[in-house]
A protein has these predicted regions:
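Residue-level hotspots within pore-lining transmembrane alpha-helices
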Residues: 26, 30, 34, 64, ...
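Small-residue-rich hydrophobic transmembrane alpha-helices
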Residues: 51-111, 148-167, 273-337, 368-390
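Short runs within selected transmembrane alpha-helices of multi-pass transporters and secretion channels
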Residues: 72, 141-159, 167-175, 196-209, ...
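Short alpha-helical transmembrane segments in multi-pass integral membrane proteins
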Residues: 1-21, 79-146, 188-243, 299-364, ...
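Transmembrane alpha-helix boundary and packing residues in multipass membrane permease domains
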Residues: 24, 28, 40, 77, ...
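Helix-terminus/linker motif at the lipid-water interface of multi-pass membrane proteins
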Residues: 29, 33-52, 121-128, 184-191, ...
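Transmembrane helical elements of multi-pass membrane transporters/channels
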Residues: 19-38, 140, 174, 203-207, ...
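N-terminal transmembrane alpha-helices
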Residues: 8-40, 44-45, 59-74, 78, ...
């Protein structure tokens, strides 16, 4: 592992942030492509009910995956902080303790997704014609949830060490296997949504095997023993960071599931169109998401090294990068959303419904660059309780009520429902600006015990 590249406490902020962010972005692009391939192949070689099933089922899988990612952020932040503090000997206990905690999380998710797949599909208000396929998709993905959780745990460890290239390799393997699996099972054997789910789980399993092999062969800045694989003093530390982030992400993703349910009431074509739009949205959010993940590691390492001003400069650098890309994505989504939707479906009604949603959502491409950069900054500063609080305000007081209100109007449209996302994000930016002012003033006179 290149120590200079992994040292964020010196050198050009812009160059090092971009160098670290590009592999993170690459991994996110492949992950988005990974999910989009399922929808694309089912949309072209499966049925409309299968397309709706993958659309709804992937929303459930996204909820689980994003919550796990945020939970794992506690591990990333803690490892980066120990590197900044020059305490690599603590990292082995972090990794060992995290392995035990995430195994338990996997077991719980396995039970819920496998044995309650059909109730979940009904709760999501999946169209009647797609309920069975939706339940099948959720059940199969639940059966392989151990691999999905393991992949995100391993990725969080490498990113905490300042290595964003290895997770890129992990997801590249998964993406290649998933494409082959989708073509074989959906296009070849006509297994529809179930085939897409099997391909997803198989790809994650092979990716985890590859990641473990790479971890064993790499030269790491820490050692780990059998005694580290237990509940230890590091567990409460990464749990205190990760739990609040996971709860916030859970409620955020729950709001998107509720949004999916609101849309499903508008019919099968609206449901399928929304599913297509969500895949495009996933791509639109890639740069802000990469910034948020990169910012947390970058800022945490600098805070651990006592370089608070450098951490602050990183925030504004990230916002600038995000806004530049966000304006381009906004223009593309707003003006060519129908063309983008056409990549995932040949059904004219589905394409139009997708584009209708994207028109309302488009502004989110710009404002999220600001919000996610600020969230990454606060995560790196261990201000995860605030990140959770502002997320709850956005979700419970703005996004959900507004989306529901729009969905029950006599002239309800996907465009109006899509507006709920950028409106709630703008509220989040205002809240975070206020907290940034408070936090900056507080850092003028920090208490000695504030650093973890």
């Amino acid at each position: 592992m290149n120590n200079d590249k992994a040292d964020f406490t010196q050198g050009s902020i812009l160059k090092k942030l971009i160098a670290f962010m590009i592999p993170v972005l690459g991994a996110l692009i492949l992950q988005a492509a990974y999910g989009a391939v399922d929808l694309l192949v089912v949309g072209r070689f499966g049925s409309t009910s299968g397309l709706s099933a993958v659309s709804t089922g992937s929303q459930v899988l996204n909820l689980v995956t994003f919550v796990v990612i945020q939970f794992a952020m506690g591990i990333t932040v803690l490892i980066a902080r120990y590197l900044g503090e020059k305490k690599p000997q603590q990292i082995g206990a972090v990794v060992g303790g995290a392995s035990i905690v995430f195994t338990i999380i996997s077991a719980v998710l396995f039970v819920v997704m496998v044995f309650f797949a059909r109730p979940i599909a009904i709760l999501m208000q999946a169209p009647e014609a797609a309920v069975d396929q939706t339940a099948s998709y959720i059940r199969i993905c639940g059966g392989g949830i151990f691999f999905i959780v393991a992949y995100n745990l391993l990725s969080s460890i490498f990113r905490g060490l300042g290595d964003s290239q290895s997770p890129l390799l992990f997801v590249l393997v998964a993406c290649i296997v998933n494409v082959i699996g989708d073509l074989a099972l959906v296009a070849g054997l006509h297994m529809d949504a179930a085939g897409a789910a099997i391909a997803t789980v198989s790809a994650q399993a092979l990716s985890v095997i590859f990641a473990i092999i790479l971890l064993i062969k790499k030269t790491l800045p820490f050692t780990i023993t059998r005694h580290d694989f237990r509940f230890n003093t590091q567990c409460p530390k990464f749990l205190s960071i990760g739990l609040s982030l996971a709860l916030q992400e859970f409620l955020t993703q729950l709001s998107f599931l509720a949004l999916c349910a609101f849309v499903n009431r508008l019919g099968l074509e609206a449901s399928s169109g929304y599913g297509v739009a969500c895949k495009i949205v996933n791509f639109a959010m890639l740069v802000p998401s990469a910034l948020m993940q990169s910012m947390a590691s970058f800022v945490s390492q600098n805070v651990g090294a006592g370089k608070v001003k450098r951490a602050r400069h990183t925030l504004f650098t990230g916002i600038g990068v995000g806004l530049c890309v966000g304006c381009i994505v906004f223009t593309l989504v707003l003006l060519k959303g129908d063309v983008l939707s056409g990549f995932f479906s040949t059904d004219a009604a589905v394409i139009q419904n997708s584009y209708d949603y994207l028109k309302g959502f488009a502004l989110e491409s710009i404002v999220t660059a600001v919000l996610f950069s600020m969230i990454g900054y606060f995560n790196g500063n261990n201000q995860t309780l605030w990140v959770m609080t502002q997320g709850l305000i956005q979700t419970l007081l703005v996004r959900l009520p507004l989306a529901y209100f729009m969905s029950i109007q006599p002239d309800a449209s996907l465009t109006k429902i899509g507006l709920a996302a950028p409106v709630s994000t703008i509220v989040g930016i205002v809240l975070n600006i206020g907290y940034y002012i408070y936090w900056t003033r507080k850092q003028q006179h920090p208490p000695v015990e504030e650093i973890i």
